[in-house]
Amino acid sequence: MEQQSYWVQTTDQQRLYVKTWGNANNPVLVLVHGYPDNQEVWEPVIGHLVQDYYIVTYDVRGAGMSSVPRRTRAYALPQLSLDLESVVNSVIPQRSFHLVAHDWGSIQSWESATEPKFRERMLSFTTISGPCLDHAAFWMREQFVQHKHQFFKQLTKSWYIAAFQLPFLAPTVWQFFSPKQWSKILSRLEGRTDLPLNHHIVADGKYGVALYRANFIPRLTKPRERFAICPVQAIVLEQDQFVSPALIDEMPKWVEDFQRVNVNANHWAILSQPEVIAKEIKRFV
């Protein structure tokens, strides 16, 4: 697949590594990756979309080839939304786009999908395994009071969030992973042995932990009411071992034009079932 690459400077002087794929005259898809991935994780899906769309991907700050901020607060959700704005203003200036995001890419993209300034440009948002932290906080409070079983079920899936708050544990642990070792873990989760290697896994894992530290406690303790400014599709992965599908049940509270589609897949379906994910993206946008 042909691609072009760019460097985009952010509002706080970081550098983001951006790629574009396909014919620039086609409708635009912006794909945002999660943790501990980089933009390469989207390539299997891109192969099924590139004939029909102009695709923009980028390494979020701290991942892949992009620069690594020194301070945790540089990973806060409002700054991540500004990063998306910097990318689209640079690569597709004044054009509208469809946003698709997975895992932490989706969590951070909710900040933009509920931001009024994107209303005229963001045509739709497809979220995969990444809830809005504000919505999740309201949901967990309600579940704790009314449905403790659901509350503790999600809590058991989110054990790693607490571990990532420890100052040195998570960065140190990632030093012991190699690309092949991480690939074996993904293969066990997804039931496939042909998944691509992430050659940046040590750095992506080590630095991306700041996403959790900068955002989870502030958002879960002081959630904001955030309403979507565009149609939203939630691709719900029924076998997801990290995000409970029940988190999606309350989404119509926050999204006026909402669509839900269930897929029998685990968390990294964008790698293990790219053709299915691409089909659902096409169907929605």
Q: What are these language model-derived features?
A:
Residues 30-34, 102, 236:
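The conserved beta1-alpha1 loop
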Residues 59, 262-264:
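Residue-level recognition of beta-strand->loop/alpha-helix junctions
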Residues 265-278:
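Catalytic histidine-centered segment of alpha/beta-hydrolase-like enzymes
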Residues 1-15:
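N-terminal cap/lid segment of alpha/beta-hydrolase-fold proteins
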Residues 14-16, 41, 56, 63-100, ...:
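Flexible "cap/lid" subdomain of the alpha/beta-hydrolase fold that forms the substrate-access gate
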Residues 45, 112, 247, 280-284:
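Hydrophobic residues on the short alpha-helix immediately C-terminal to a glycine-rich phosphate/catalytic loop
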Residues 84, 88, 277, 281, ...:
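Hydrophobic "lid"/C-terminal helical patch
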